[in-house]
Curated annotation (Swiss-Prot):
It is an enzyme of class 3 (hydrolase). Its main location: membrane. Residues 23-58 are cytoplasmic. This is Signal peptidase I. It comes from Pseudomonas fluorescens. The gene is lepB. The keyword Oxidoreductase does not apply. It holds the Pfam family Peptidase_S26.
Amino acid sequence: MSLNFPLLLVIAVAVCGLLALLDLVFFAPRRRSAIASYQGSVSQPDAVVIEKLNKEPLLVEYGKSFFPVLFIVLVLRSFLVEPFQIPSGSMKPTLDVGDFILVNKFSYGIRLPVIDKKVIEVGDPQRGDVMVFRYPSDPNVNYIKRVVGLPGDVVRYTSDKRLFINGESVAEKLLGAEPNTLGSAELYQEKLGAVEHEIRKEMSRYRAMPDGQWKVPAGHYFMMGDNRDNSNDSRYWDDPNIPKDLLGMVPDENIVGKAFAVWMSWPEPKLSHLPNFSRVGLIK
């Protein structure tokens, strides 16, 4: 069972906030009253006794201490920026296994934590954006891919690995063989909308499926990995519980945010590597 960290964070903030509120309206007045009664009953109040009477319950003390920290984390993570780690090579060469990235949570609208309901419109995904989203077949799993098809687009990917959007071939330019692959993989520069980025194709690997064509419904997006022959993306998703016309599509409510930067890398296996900052930079 996957850990629902946003839900746990909201619960932690709520519990700590409740403890702080209870102290404000109930425990603190009782402490002040006890101190006043004690001071009125003796001619020379003992500072040690006053300190003991004014001591907060341990649970309240922890709650009040953690509340501001957890609240700030909740606001930052839910509405501004959230960190993620790249678990696979499906976005090579743009992102590699072990990259730690930052995701802008407000680029595509302000959403409430846990329920992910959009409450403030800000903007929509654009073709070429690198986007984190919840996998349609298992919303507890986050995926990261590049936005290829927008609502209303017709996307076609051919058996010879060419991409077409609305009948027009997407521009790409061969950059050369990928280093350390003995020529088995090539890198291309592709332009999606206003975004120029690199993609990877394996020359020795043939697609197991024929030409595919998809019509992107309203409120949905078609996603592909930059590592075109090693990416579980909109081209391949299949789920009997999802209507046929929505197979491969990411609904707007599943959007997490826009990936915009790599801030650290820690290659696998982590026990034999150290974190490094060689790949730090903005994501194209």
